[in-house]
Amino acid sequence: MVKCDYVYFIKGFFRMEHVNSTPPARPLLEMKGIAKRFGTFYALQDVDLSIYRGEIHALMGENGAGKSTLMKILAGAYTASAGEILIDGEPFPISSPKDAIKAGITLIYQEIHLSPNLTVAENIFLGCEIKTLFGLDRKTMAEESQKVLDRLGAQFLATQKVSSLTIAEQQQVEIARALYRKSRILVMDEPTAALSSRETERLFALVKKLRDEGMAIIYISHRMAEIYELADRVSVLRDGKYVGSLTRDNLDSATLVQMMVGRPLTDLFNKEKVPVGEEVLRVENLSDGHKLKDASLVVRAGEIVGLSGLVGAGRSELAHLLFGVKRATKGKIYLSGGEISFSSPREAIAHHVALLPENRKEEGLFLDLNILKNVTMATLERDATMLVIDQNKGKQTTQAAIEGLKMRVPSANVNVSGLSGGNQQKVLLSRWAAIEPKLFIMDEPTRGVDVGAKSEIYRMMIEMAKKGVAILMISSELPEIVGMSDRVYVMREGYTVGELEGDDINQERIMAFACGAQS
């Protein structure tokens, strides 16, 4: 069995470690009829949510469904346009973070919100410092902080600088701050996004411990395996509206997916048979002199060719050579029959070769620019006449991308940094689709996006294949490789070690090649 969240999700192999107890009769938290409007755009409409003491309540939905907006209202970062919040059955208006703290609510964002140059204790007491006549009582703050850290089982000291801690340890600091403030409701937004598997296990143990101590935990995640591991109840949002809730006893992956995206799980890939055209890419014995030892493959027009393998097999290195990020030390690359060797990505783009990088934030997006500028970044030269950029053409391209990929955004002028992971990936895909590629290399095209966004990306890939685009898809998700690929190459330790097609494309054969069990 491959240890992949999505594999577990498809096959339904989940662990159920605790027995769900009957919740108290009255919710600790109720959100009734919550709406949030940004101009004419409704991010939330008439949303209801109830949370009980001593439960882990998962909040799910596609990227852009309104999960983070709802939680920001709860934390006082946004003010609701309509609706009310009740704590212990009594109305409790929240219009600022200070109100949320008074209500006993703490939101731990996906991006850590700590001051790195301060100590752990100073961060825990930030805004509620202990003072004496002579200034801050750092000794008492450190002692009190250490008590909370010990309760959490932390392996670091309250006197350490936050900058010296790992992401997982910084999360513990945020949880410690919530405990010191006697928070009763803890909201965690995609807390495992930057954690290793071992750190994730420790976090799960801590979350369960807090639940057992009576804390109410709202857990936002798109990872199905985490939901089955932790959740007592699950509520789903779709398009800014409340769809429904499921208890642990009737939790079912197919039902959850249908609630999130409005269609059955079986429609996720919806792969169509596309006529295959002429050879677009041929790679012969390619090497970069380091991780990539000897890779050979072929991709034809209209094909989606999967490239699978374990981490470190050399797949991304191959992508970088094909796009001109690095130069090959050995081997040959042919594009539409002609031998090529790109010296830069700019040269690759000029030949209509696109690369969707593995890490969209560090290698692909300009986070401080808006959607329009990100989408048109690769076509500025093409759309310029006498050094004047055709703004209307760029706007039309961007608006078509927003509508075609169903991005839930107010406008093309929104900064990319504020978008969900799924919408960020759609922006990047739209940029490269705009160059009208003949070869599109996609490195982990659906990493970090929810099920709904995956479906939209798959649909886009199929439409591009119909237009004759040759797609080389690198993916670590075996269901994705199996569900989307016409043929599959498998890499191991820098070598292409197997090619599969037709009925031979299955998870077992792929892993046999990847692990060296088959040659």
Swiss-Prot record:
ABC transporter domain residues: 29-264, 275-518
Recorded GO MF terms: ABC-type D-ribose transporter activity; ATP binding; ATP hydrolysis activity
Disulphides: none
Catalytic activity line of the entry: D-ribose(out) + ATP + H2O = D-ribose(in) + ADP + phosphate + H(+)
Membrane topology, record value: Peripheral membrane protein
Subunit structure as annotated in this protein's UniProt entry: The complex is composed of an ATP-binding protein (RbsA), two transmembrane proteins (RbsC) and a solute-binding protein (RbsB).
This protein's name: Ribose import ATP-binding protein RbsA 2
Organism this protein belongs to: Pasteurella multocida (strain Pm70)
